[in-house]
Amino acid sequence: MKTLSPAVITLLWRQDAAEFYFSRLSHLPWAMLLHSGYADHPYSRFDIVVAEPICTLTTFGKETVVSESEKRTTTTDDPLQVLQQVLDRADIRPTHNEDLPFQGGALGLFGYDLGRRFESLPEIAEQDIVLPDMAVGIYDWALIVDHQRHTVSLLSHNDVNARRAWLESQQFSPQEDFTLTSDWQSNMTREQYGEKFRQVQEYLHSGDCYQVNLAQRFHATYSGDEWQAFLQLNQANRAPFSAFLRLEQGAILSLSPERFILCDNSEIQTRPIKGTLPRLPDPQEDSKQAVKLANSAKDRAENLMIVDLMRNDIGRVAVAGSVKVPELFVVEPFPAVHHLVSTITAQLPEQLHASDLLRAAFPGGSITGAPKVRAMEIIDELEPQRRNAWCGSIGYLSFCGNMDTSITIRTLTAINGQIFCSAGGGIVADSQEEAEYQETFDKVNRILKQLEK
């Protein structure tokens, strides 16, 4: 195994370096950007730009296609096992570097429906978006923008100077402005949402489940460049786990406030969000809103259920006795909403990989409910369409062993002139129908309205 670290050269610092370079790459299939959203947030340190992967993995249903130069292999093996084998085959294991969290490796999308490969679920919801369940590139280079140290680092396991020349030779080609060509429409009426809410309540009161995340999906048609839409949304939403992925079939625009799982030098962290109230224009009223959320018995109960679920999921692979909860019920403000967040930490054993951790906890419990598998069965029964990219994860598994992933909430899927955006909320036994319905709008109204401008 090569322990050589990648060659690194430092480029001129500019705060918008990630967008500056990615704007020239944004049209290339498999060009991907992880962006910290300029957020005033402790986890808004790094932006990561990649393109031109040396290998790609795409999973549709039971089949994963691995494409490496001219060679294409199709397998029905566990997709995360296949991914780990591809990473192992690269035979690169650089030493940990806290200033370079991603030193090449796997980066991309793990859609919600990838969970069907790890749990047995019904197939009731319509599959109407033809994007892969997993779309991951293996990259031997990356551009890392560090907003803490004010550095722009280009790293490569091949000729770093050739990569720099390639990057600087890319031409910015003006694209058509992004425009919605229809109004947003939901996939369910208010009455239909009410019926589904009451069905969830029946399941809860019969003891089938104790929390279910129920969502509605909004849809519009559009023309123009999706990257232009992302630039506009990213500036306005300042979400620490934002991302733009250009896939062969379409684009993913993510403005996520939520970390799924970080594994940094075998230290595990997950930060589930459960509990939401809208921000208010008046600062004093807004402060009261934050206090109200912090003291909400319902939201604390919801949050605690997911903390317990995530402790259990991570505990399946963590070092025995290492799972801890250093933060419980912390209110974090974002531009549109206040969120109630908790933090769980643990240690990954030496013999396991980050991919084992991802599999053990996927998809994140904060967007399913609890118990997880039963909640996912109910979701498949009640939501008209499959979730696809929404409520999955975007992130990386670095050659050095690190992993960082988001939960893809506040995330739009753009494909064939159609754009989709979903929002849901955790329903528990004492949830109020109107409040839950309104919460779905509180979460995405800001995004939907920005694209209408």
Swiss-Prot record:
Inhibited by 6-diazo-5-oxo-L-norleucine (DON). The inhibition is competitive with glutamine but uncompetitive with chorismate. Also inhibited by 2-fluorochorismate. Disruption phenotype: Cells lacking this gene do not produce 4-aminobenzoate. L-tryptophan binds at residues 36, 43-46, 240-242. Changing residue 258 to A: The reaction is extremely slow. The keyword Ribonucleoprotein does not apply. GO terms for biological process: 4-aminobenzoate biosynthetic process; folic acid biosynthetic process; L-tryptophan biosynthetic process; tetrahydrofolate biosynthetic process. The keyword NAD does not apply. Its cofactor is Mg(2+). InterPro entries: ADC_synth_comp_1, ADC_synthase, Anth_synth_I-like, Anth_synth_I_N, Chorismate_C. Changing residue 322 to T: Complete loss of aminodeoxychorismate synthase activity. GO terms for cellular component: aminodeoxychorismate synthase complex. Pathway: Cofactor biosynthesis; tetrahydrofolate biosynthesis; 4-aminobenzoate from chorismate: step 1/2. Changing residue 316 to H: Catalytically inactive for both the glutamine-dependent and ammonia-dependent reactions and fails to interact with PabA. It catalyses: chorismate + L-glutamine = 4-amino-4-deoxychorismate + L-glutamate. Keywords: Folate biosynthesis, Magnesium, Transferase. The active site is at residues 258, 274. One of its GO terms (molecular function) is magnesium ion binding. NCBIfam families: pabB (TIGR00553), PRK15465.1 (NF012009). Belongs to the anthranilate synthase component I family. This is Aminodeoxychorismate synthase component 1. The lineage of its organism: Bacteria, Pseudomonadati, Pseudomonadota, Gammaproteobacteria, Enterobacterales.
